[in-house]
């Protein structure tokens, strides 16, 4: 016959098992009736995080996962409408679409999949430092008005060329506003490459030939691990605090708490992320292949995200 202590222990154990069962049921309830749709973003770190999260939900929790392509603004609007459920790499506060949806209670940011992210306007280091530097006094964005000739646009030789983000990215709108606020719109063309890889190709081509180039860029990325670039300083008070979270639809956030708890724990150290992205680019691998290899090589990552023993076993078996 159990003692009072053992009865309490059994009761506590029963409650714990009940909570675990309830959590599993919550995940099963969502995934039994509908898929988890991810934003099909088109930049490297976002694609990798999408695959990491999707792999864990698919193999650990038997979810059907899908990725819906589109540009950032369209996908954030889809998130607000619960047409998709997860935006794996949401730069919080950057997008008006996100800000409006968050204020209306339609989206929720959780976790910190990336910490230490950066962004800004960059030039090659050889342009501003070292022997033969053509612009040793170029330090800030405000200085650029004096250097339009250095960054001459081959299609409009009377202006310099600024390489913006592809059209449809949130940063494209912000950079356009910055060109105007710094009085650079009349001195530089606002060149928008068609895709992220096209922007990378322009930077790599210029730096291989030691040519001047002025571009927006960000980290984590494989490119900044391979090309030595210097970030130009913005005006005082304009440096941005970057917070990256997993963006969730409110319906998913409220309807699948166990899955949300997993996504809120997803984090890849930025040094490992940059190194992995560089290796992916070098090997010409796709994001699903890289994600699986990363999870296999670093079980300490996903084991910190997934606390359920049964889910862990299924993920391990899938690797």
Descriptions of predicted regions:
Residues 30-45, 63-68, 159-163, 263:
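Short, well-ordered beta-strand elements
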Residues 25-38, 151-159, 303-305, 319:
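Immediate post-signal peptide segment of exported/extracytoplasmic ligand-binding proteins
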Residues 120-132, 242-256, 279:
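A bilobed periplasmic-binding-protein/Venus flytrap-type ligand-binding module shared by bacterial periplasmic
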Residues 44-63, 177-180:
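Short, polar/charged alpha-helical segment
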Residues 45, 169-189, 194-200, 204-208, ...:
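An extracytoplasmic/periplasmic, membrane-proximal ligand-sensing/linker region
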């Amino acid at each position: 016959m159990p003692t009072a202590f053992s009865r309490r222990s059994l009761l506590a154990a029963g409650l714990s098992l009940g909570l675990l069962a309830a959590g599993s049921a919550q995940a099963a309830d969502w995934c039994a009736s509908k898929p988890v749709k991810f934003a099909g973003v088109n930049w490297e770190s976002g694609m990798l995080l999408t695959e990491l999260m999707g792999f864990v939900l698919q193999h650990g929790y038997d979810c059907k996962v899908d990725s819906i392509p589109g540009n950032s603004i369209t996908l954030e609007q889809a998130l607000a409408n619960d047409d998709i459920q997860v935006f794996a790499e949401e730069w919080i506060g950057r997008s008006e679409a996100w800000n409006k949806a968050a204020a209306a209670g339609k989206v929720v940011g959780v976790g910190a999949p990336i910490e230490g992210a950066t962004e800004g306007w960059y030039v090659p280091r050889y342009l501003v430092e070292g022997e033969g530097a053509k612009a040793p006094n170029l330090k800030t964005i405000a200085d650029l008005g004096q250097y339009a000739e250095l960054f001459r646009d081959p299609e409009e030789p009377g202006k310099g060329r600024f390489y913006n983000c592809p059209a449809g990215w949130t940063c494209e709108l912000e950079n356009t506003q910055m060109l105007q606020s710094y009085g650079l719109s009349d001195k530089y063309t606002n060149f928008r490459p068609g895709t992220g890889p096209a922007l990378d190709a322009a930077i790599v081509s210029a730096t291989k030939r030691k040519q001047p180039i002025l571009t927006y860029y960000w980290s984590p990325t494989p490119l900044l691990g391979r090309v030595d670039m210097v970030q130009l300083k913005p005006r005082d008070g304009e440096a941005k605090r970057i917070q990256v979270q997993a963006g969730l639809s409110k319906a998913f956030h409220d309807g699948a708490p166990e899955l949300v708890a997993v996504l809120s724990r997803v984090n890849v150290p930025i040094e490992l992320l940059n190194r992995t992205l560089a290796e992916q680019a070098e090997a010409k691998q796709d994001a699903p292949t890289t994600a699986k290899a990363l999870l296999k090589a670093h079980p300490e990552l996903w084991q910190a995200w997934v606390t359920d023993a049964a889910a862990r076993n299924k993920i391990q078996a899938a690797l």
